[in-house]
Amino acid sequence: MDNQLDVPLGILKLPVPLKEDYNRRQKLIELIEKPLWTITGKCAKNTLIPDLVSICKVNDQHQFIIFDAKYYNAHLEKGIVPTGQPGIESITKQYLYQLAYQQFIEDHNFSSVKNCFLLPTENNEIEDKGEVRMEMLSNLGLQDIKIRLIPATMAYDLYLSGSKMDMERLDL
């Protein structure tokens, strides 16, 4: 998936040159704010950590893509109440990842932002299972979360061969 969380900002292939306000050696993961505990005047050690962030060019458009891999056996079929799907905490956290990177995304003129849950499937093809949306967060300009089921055998093969998936296959 070409995870770029631990890549220094100065190396990333951005739509425009890195803005001067950013440290070229700082990593993408380090842009996420840590909680400040006001009584101590100190920040906590931990913060939000997305599974994967990819910066790629698809159809001449620079995309900032935030992935969260889930190991659920979700049943998502038209007209049927969903079961086995990621919970509210996973959904809100995925929206927060975008919010955490929003300034960086705006500063560097990305064409689009994509949020996506990746779930396994025993089938042989990538499956588009729509999106999950929370209107109050969509109304803030955050992107709804796309759902893609990835064949488990494909994921294993890519991992074992050290290969990266072509993002266009996900049709985000």
What kind of region is each of these model predictions?
Residues 1-172:
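Catalytic core segments in nucleotide and nucleic-acid processing enzymes
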